[in-house]
A protein has these predicted regions:
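Hydrophobic alpha-helical transmembrane segments of membrane proteins
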Residues: 1-109, 122-232
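A glycine- and small/hydrophobic-rich beta-loop-beta segment
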Residues: 112
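Short helix-to-coil transition segments within interhelical loops
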Residues: 116-121
C-alpha cells in the first residue's frame, strides 16, 4: 500500500490537460434557404449538443412504433375501429412535432430576450421552426413505410396523418407555444424538461385538439363516402 501511494502522490498527475474534440457543424448546404437557414442551423445544433433537446430525436423514433399498438392484435381488438388509424397516423409521423414543436419558443428561453433584441423578423423565426417540423414529419413518414406490410389502407392513414401534421398541426403547435410559459433549462439534470414542469394541464389541453380534430374530420368524411373519402 505504501508503494502504491508513493508513486501516485504527485501534484503534476492531477494537472494533466484533458483534450476533447469539439463538435463543429457548418451546415453550409442550408444557406440556400436564406435567412431561415440561420434559425434552422441553430436548432439543429441545439438538438445535437444538449441532452434535453436530443431526447426529442429518441422519443420521435419511439413514436414510429406506436402504430403497432393499433395495427396489430396486441390491443385485443380495442382499437379496431377505422378512426383509430388516423389517431395512429398522427402519432407515428408527429413525434417530433409534439416533443419539439410543442415547446416553441421555450427551447430558446435561455437566450430569447437577447435574440428578440436583435434585428430579427419573428415570422422568419417561426418559419424556421415550421421547416424543422416539416422535415422531421417527412422523415418519419418515410421511416414509417414499413407499415405497408399491414396494408395500403394503413399506410394511407399514416400519409394522411403526415399531411395533416404539416398543414394544420404544424401551425397549431407554433400558435399554442405562445401559451406555454415554462422555460426549458438545457443545462439542468433535475427534470426531463428543466427546472420547471413544462408538461402541465395547459399543455395537455393544447394537445387534445391536435389529436382528436383529425379523427372527427375523418369520421365525418367516412360517413359520406367510406374510409378512403375520410382520408381525403
Amino acid at each position: 500500500a505504501f508503494t502504491h501511494f508513493k508513486h501516485r502522490m504527485y501534484l503534476d498527475s492531477g494537472l494533466q490537460v484533458v483534450k476533447k474534440e469539439a463538435l463543429n457543424l457548418q451546415l453550409g448546404w442550408l444557406n440556400r434557404f436564406g435567412r431561415t437557414a440561420i434559425f434552422v442551423k441553430n436548432d439543429i445544433k441545439l438538438i445535437l449538443r444538449n441532452k434535453r433537446s436530443k431526447m426529442t430525436i429518441w422519443v420521435s423514433i419511439g413514436f414510429l412504433f406506436y402504430g403497432l399498438l393499433f395495427f396489430t392484435d396486441s390491443s385485443g381488438g380495442l382499437y379496431n375501429a377505422p378512426v383509430w388509424k388516423i389517431f395512429a397516423g398522427i402519432f407515428v409521423t408527429g413525434g417530433f412535432l409534439f416533443t419539439f414543436g410543442q415547446y416553441v419558443p421555450s427551447w430558446d428561453s435561455s437566450y430569447y430576450p437577447l435574440m428578440m433584441s436583435q434585428n430579427i423578423v419573428y415570422i422568419e423565426y417561426l418559419n424556421a421552426k415550421w421547416a424543422m417540423i416539416t422535415i422531421a414529419t417527412m422523415a418519419s413518414t418515410v421511416l414509417g413505410s414499413f407499415y405497408i406490410i399491414f396494408g395500403w389502407d394503413v399506410y394511407a392513414a399514416i400519409l394522411t396523418g403526415a399531411i395533416y401534421n404539416i398543414g394544420v398541426n404544424g401551425h397549431l403547435v407554433l400558435l399554442s407555444g405562445a401559451f406555454i410559459k415554462s422555460p426549458i433549462d438545457l443545462t439542468s439534470t433535475k427534470k426531463p424538461f428543466g427546472d420547471k414542469q413544462a408538461f402541465n394541464a395547459k399543455t395537455l389541453l393544447l394537445i387534445l385538439p391536435k389529436l382528436f380534430l383529425p379523427m372527427i374530420l375523418y369520421f365525418i368524411g367516412s360517413l359520406y363516402g367510406g374510409e378512403w373519402v375520410g382520408y381525403m
